[in-house]
Amino acid sequence: MLRQVLSSTSVRRLLVSPTRCMSGKQNVPDKIEYSTPPEIIDYEESPHLPVPEYPIRPDEPLETRKQRLLYQSRKRGMLENDLLLSTFVAKYLKDFDAEETAQYDQLINGVSNDWDIYYWATNTKPTPPEYDTDVMKLLKQHVKNTERVQRIRQPDL
């Protein structure tokens, strides 16, 4: 299939003559400068898309809960939180008691927006009182990375 596409005359002309690709564009800048936005833009929650409540699992054994939290910390769908939470869990979750494990479960599953967790952990936004627990304080300390540990990938399982 690729050979057929490459052998077509129109594709060959584009490959041989790259100026044809740019023929429609005038005043193309040599250098593009990017700037960071001055503030975080948060939109109000849409009333049309209700987020279901996370089911509370009171009878879940502690080891099963820790295994579930390990998985959920690694699979957030957001690379920043994947790295922060997976390294946090690898370091601290094994030593958590039932109360601390419940606090961590509430933190990562009670919030409907993962960006909130990220902003709270990095002290970009103030943490609401219901999530300002000992586990959150420990997470904030972990995010500061005072030991200068390299966190470019998730820890091995």
Curated annotation (Swiss-Prot):
Residues 1-21 form a transit peptide. Gene3D superfamilies: Flavinator of succinate dehydrogenase. Pfam families: Sdh5. GO terms for cellular component: mitochondrial matrix; mitochondrion. Its main location: mitochondrion. Keywords: Chaperone, Mitochondrion, Transit peptide. Transmembrane segments: none annotated. It is found in: Mitochondrion matrix. It comes from the Eukaryota. GO terms for biological process: mitochondrial electron transport, succinate to ubiquinone; mitochondrial respiratory chain complex II assembly; protein-FAD linkage; tricarboxylic acid cycle. Interacts with the flavoprotein subunit within the SDH catalytic dimer. Plays an essential role in the assembly of succinate dehydrogenase (SDH), an enzyme complex (also referred to as respiratory complex II) that is a component of both the tricarboxylic acid (TCA) cycle and the mitochondrial electron transport chain, and which couples the oxidation of succinate to fumarate with the reduction of ubiquinone (coenzyme Q) to ubiquinol. Required for flavinylation (covalent attachment of FAD) of the flavoprotein subunit of the SDH catalytic dimer. HAMAP family: SDHAF2. Belongs to the SDHAF2 family. This is Succinate dehydrogenase assembly factor 2-A, mitochondrial. It comes from Drosophila mojavensis (Fruit fly).
